[in-house]
């Protein structure tokens, strides 16, 4: 099989753009896993906050300038990662918007250069914007074409094609059944042969709700991804299960209920978008968002890029980045003296810095509760303030001692709320 390389002049230009973005404080990819296995870092060892979005059809259903709009708007909203299916939704044989099918004669061993040149162009735009694509190069619906016999060769080919592109993570989507294990191992082996281990590898079981835990011990699995679909109540326990597995690996809540999705039996409002995300992060995971109109490629896909839920997750990211050493977050429900809850769809959750430098409490609805102030061990005096997850606006509560128990009630009129406790400076 022939591999098309990026022309030298264009490659050099992209390197310059990439270097410029790095100097501006952008992460330097490819992505790596931290030494403690809890979070992601760039090539300089700097922690990277995984806030992802979902654009399954980006390679197949959009013109190049439309893809550019999506990527640029996605990055501007604060998302650093985008989940994309290499062959799009379906069985892997549907042509792209230009009429090009992925494979000649539907054979993965004879890839169609016309299809993959378009993928190349989209990948380059993502690289220019320093947006990492989590590229699903196998889906269980592709199983009639990607088989145990050709999986390694197919994976090696695609990995070689993008072996020097830093803004890629490899992903696969099997069913969570042991019968898929041999195929996943062949695919992973092909990816490693093709790119020499340059990119991280993961998989996300489909359908939901399932984590990747049934192959957690596999050496090639760099981090674990799960999906919960409409079962919001499954997020916290599933993340907790994965978080506590050994060896320690980062956990990503990769797919929940899409904003404005119509198939869940309830309206996925911005509040539900926020709840899913905060449940993920305060359980110790990372998170990916999705909008119904984007993955379905509805006529309103462009408006969906500015959906309230997407905007409010950008606010979430800023809230976390404002916490000193946010990457040392530890889920800890013992922060609550009373009022914490991890069961059901409306939760009250707490997490803290591993050394007690701050405490974060998320309330899924109006709530009264009490806090063990001794969980904040840095300094003697503690300041408390509310943050409205919808707007990011803060409201001072007061100062307290870091001993004993203090009671709090979230502000009236707020749908949900964050309470932050930090040492007085």
Task: Go through each PLM region and give its residues.
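Non-catalytic accessory regions flanking glycosidase/transglycosidase catalytic cores in CAZymes
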Residues: 24-77, 356-357, 371, 376-397, ...
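Bacterial N-terminal signal peptides that target proteins for export
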Residues: 1-12
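Short, flexible, glycine/charge-rich loop motifs used to bind or transfer phosphoryl groups or to couple energy/partner
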Residues: 72, 158-160, 211-216, 240-242, ...
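Active-site mouth of glycoside hydrolases
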Residues: 28-234
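N-terminal signal peptide c-region/cleavage motif recognized by signal peptidases
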Residues: 19-20
């Amino acid at each position: 099989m022939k591999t098309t390389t990026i022309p030298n002049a264009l490659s050099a230009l992209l390197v310059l753009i990439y270097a410029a973005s790095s100097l501006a404080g952008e992460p330097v990819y490819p992505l790596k896993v931290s030494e403690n296995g809890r979070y992601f870092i760039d090539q300089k060892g700097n922690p990277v906050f995984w806030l992802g979005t979902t654009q399954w059809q980006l390679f197949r259903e959009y013109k190049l300038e439309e893809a550019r709009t999506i990527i640029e708007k996605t990055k501007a909203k604060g998302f650093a990662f985008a989940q994309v299916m290499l062959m799009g939704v379906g069985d892997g044989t549907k042509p792209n918007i230009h009429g090009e099918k992925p494979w000649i004669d539907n054979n993965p061993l004879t890839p169609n250069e016309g299809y993959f040149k378009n993928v190349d162009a989209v990948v380059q735009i993502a690289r220019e914007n320093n947006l990492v694509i989590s590229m699903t190069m196998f889906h269980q619906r592709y199983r009639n074409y990607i088989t145990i016999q050709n999986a390694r060769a197919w994976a090696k080919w695609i990995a070689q094609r993008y072996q020097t592109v830093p803004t890629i993570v490899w992903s696969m989507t099997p069913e969570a059944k042991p019968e898929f294990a041999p195929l996943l191992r062949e695919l992973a082996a092909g990816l490693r042969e093709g790119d020499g281990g340059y990119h991280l590898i993961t998989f996300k079981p489909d359908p939901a709700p399932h984590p990747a835990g049934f192959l957690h011990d596999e050496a090639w699995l760099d981090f674990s991804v799960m999906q919960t679909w409409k079962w919001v109540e499954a997020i916290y326990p599933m993340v907790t299960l994965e978080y506590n597995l050994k060896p320690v690996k980062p956990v990503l809540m990769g797919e929940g209920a899409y904003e404005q999705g119509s198939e869940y039996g309830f309206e996925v409002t911005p509040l539900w978008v926020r709840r899913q995300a905060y449940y993920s992060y305060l359980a110790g995971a990372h998170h990916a968002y999705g909008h119904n109109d984007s993955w379905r490629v509805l006529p309103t896909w462009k408006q969906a890029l500015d959906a309230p839920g997407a905007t409010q997750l950008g606010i979430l990211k800023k809230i976390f980045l404002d916490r000193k050493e946010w990457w040392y977050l530890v889920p800890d429900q013992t922060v609550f003296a009373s009022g914490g809850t991890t069961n059901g769809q409306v939760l009250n959750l707490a997490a803290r810095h591993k050394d007690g430098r701050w405490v974060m409490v998320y309330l899924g609805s109006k709530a009264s509760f009490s806090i063990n102030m001794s969980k904040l061990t840095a300094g003697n005096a503690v300041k408390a303030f509310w943050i409205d997850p919808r707007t990011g606006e803060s409201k001072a509560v007061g100062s307290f001692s870091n001993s004993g128990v203090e009671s709090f009630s979230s502000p009236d009129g707020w749908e949900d709320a964050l309470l932050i406790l930090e040492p007085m400076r």
